[in-house]
A protein has these predicted regions:
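C-terminal motif of bacterial Sec signal peptides marking the signal peptidase cleavage site
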Residues: 17-21
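Bacterial signal peptide processing site
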Residues: 23-25
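Extracytoplasmic "Venus flytrap"
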Residues: 32-60, 71-80, 173, 227-230
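An alpha-beta-alpha
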Residues: 53, 141-188, 289-304
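Structural motif
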Residues: 69-90, 199-213
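Beta-alpha junction/loop-to-helix N-cap segments that form part of ligand/metal-binding clefts
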Residues: 75-131, 225-240, 244-248
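Hydrophobic alpha-helical segments within soluble ligand-binding/sensing domains
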Residues: 124-163, 263-283
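Hinge/cleft segment of the Venus flytrap/periplasmic-binding protein
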Residues: 278-320
Length: 320
């Protein structure tokens, strides 16, 4: 065998081994991991989701400071920050984790190579994140915070039978909020109730728009919404002064409303964390079903109930 021919065969052999090694690397189980987290906003629900995610990783053998390195970025509710933050994480981790729809969309647009998991997303199909809940089909899966909106409206009308006009308030630029708001409007109209919808696109408009809404309705429904969560104190003060009872889909803003009925964000964060563990151990995101919330929980703001002259125990009883 000639030297050139032998060299060529050796080169092909090495190239084949190299490609095989790359394929193995892409699907092999990690003994330790680097994980990037991009969180859309700073509020208790999203913080709880992040905590649940980290907990699940630890339970799966990836403990921060030992076998897990975490890099976290928080956009503070400003979508303009997301692209830069995604660029800081892209290609530098074994897996990325997005908390809330805007963060997940930015991550998918900016890094399609790194496996990713999301949570606190209401409708990942409409948001363009996955092909379907059963078969995500790409390099991303996660857990959703979709709630039974029709069930929430049933609860609202039982708790507030005197309400004839119900307001809905949310940030129209958030896909998840839009989905819930439309479902709530439909459910309320089926009950022959008048519906008044008011929206904002930034936190700067919350006080003015919410004040206007509170003066025109008998009750308010707040879907899962990052802007609502981050301005809960302002919203609560307005509703209390106007003596308008309200229901929220997220206990992150329980302080602003009479009661909430929604998902446990730490629990859905933990669901996403379990999926992340499976991916880090070699499973493809494309084949991991998007996880759904296991059970809604009801919480009542006793201080708000007292301020409105309502019986908090009677509302709590509706959830049993």
């Amino acid at each position: 065998m000639g030297f050139k021919k032998a060299s060529l065969i050796a080169f092909i052999g090495l190239a084949t081994l190299s490609l095989a090694a790359c394929r193995k690397e892409a699907g092999q189980a990690h003994q330790s991991a680097k994980v990037g987290i991009i969180q859309y906003a700073e509020h208790s629900a999203l913080d709880a989701a992040r905590e649940g995610f980290i907990e699940a990783l630890a339970e799966g053998g990836f403990k921060e400071g030992k076998t897990l390195t975490v890099t976290t970025r928080n956009a503070q509710g400003d979508q303009a920050n997301l692209q830069t933050m995604v660029e800081q994480l892209a290609g530098k981790n074994d897996l990325n984790f997005a908390i809330a729809t805007p963060a997940a969309q930015a991550l998918l647009n900016g890094d399609q190579e790194t496996p990713a998991v999301f949570t606190a997303v209401t409708d990942p199909v409409s948001a363009g994140l996955v092909d379907s809940l059963a078969k995500p089909g790409g390099n991303m899966t996660g857990s959703i915070d979709a709630t039974d909106v029709a069930g929430q409206i049933d609860l609202l009308t039982k708790a507030l039978p005197q309400a004839k006009t119900v307001g809905i308030f949310y940030n129209s630029s958030e896909v998840n909020s839009e989905v819930q708001a439309k479902a709530a409007k439909k459910a309320l109209e089926k009950k022959d109730l008048k519906v008044l919808v008011k929206t904002v696109t930034t936190t700067n408009d919350v006080q003015q728009v919410m004040t206007s809404l509170a003066n025109q309705v008998d009750a308010v429904y707040l879907p899962t919404d990052n802007t609502v969560a981050s301005t809960a104190s302002t919203i609560g003060d307005i509703l209390k002064e106007a003596k308008v009872p309200s229901m929220g889909s997220d206990d992150a803003y329980l302080s602003a409303v009479l009661f909430t009925s929604g998902v446990d964000y730490k629990a859905i964060g933990k669901q996403a964390g379990k999926e992340a563990v499976a991916i880090l151990k070699g499973k493809s995101p494309a084949t991991i079903k998007v996880a759904k919330p296991e059970k809604a929980k009801i919480a009542v703001n006793d201080d708000m109930a007292k301020a409105l002259g309502m019986d908090s125990q009677a509302i709590k009883a509706l959830g049993k």
